[in-house]
Amino acid sequence: MAYAQWVIIIIHNVGSQDVKIKNLKASWGKLHADGDKDAEVSASNYEGKIVKPDEKLQINACGRSDAAEGTTGTFDLVDPADGDKQVRHFYWDCPWGSKTNTWTVSGSNTKWMIEYSGQNLDSGALGTITVDTLKKGN
């Protein structure tokens, strides 16, 4: 039932410097393994993961089956070369029984460029969102 509410977030490091994921939390729904909504995974599997240059990291979340809930969550991208200074904060909300989804990117770190695409803000799944990260300069 609520498996129709899902999001896949692909972090793609298109730059030449590492970026790290921190503080991933699904406050509604669950995180799951690639391609298997029944295989729940812990946020700790992602905590502190480094996305190296030209690598991708995929985060999958969905509502719970047979439950009237969608998926909501947050995470941060941080700069491991700058004391884990926040690059951006990300928030998603793909609620069950609502006609509106939310994808918000907040914060500012002028050393980094962040571009994203693919989010569906209408009803149904939030979809597959690609987040490109690039640290400016060396």
Curated annotation (Swiss-Prot):
InterPro entries recorded: Aegerolysin-typ (IPR009413)
Superkingdom of this protein's organism: Eukaryota
One GO term of the biological process aspect: symbiont-mediated hemolysis of host erythrocyte
Alphabetically ordered keywords of this record: Cytolysis, Hemolysis
A family per Pfam: Aegerolysin
Subunit details: Monomer.
Similarity section: Belongs to the aegerolysin family.
Function: Has hemolytic activity against bovine erythrocytes at nanomolar concentrations in vitro. Promotes active pleurotolysin B (PlyB)-dependent permeabilization of membranes rich in cholesterol and sphingomyelin. May play an important role in the initial phase of fungal fruiting.
Protein name per Swiss-Prot or TrEMBL: Ostreolysin A6
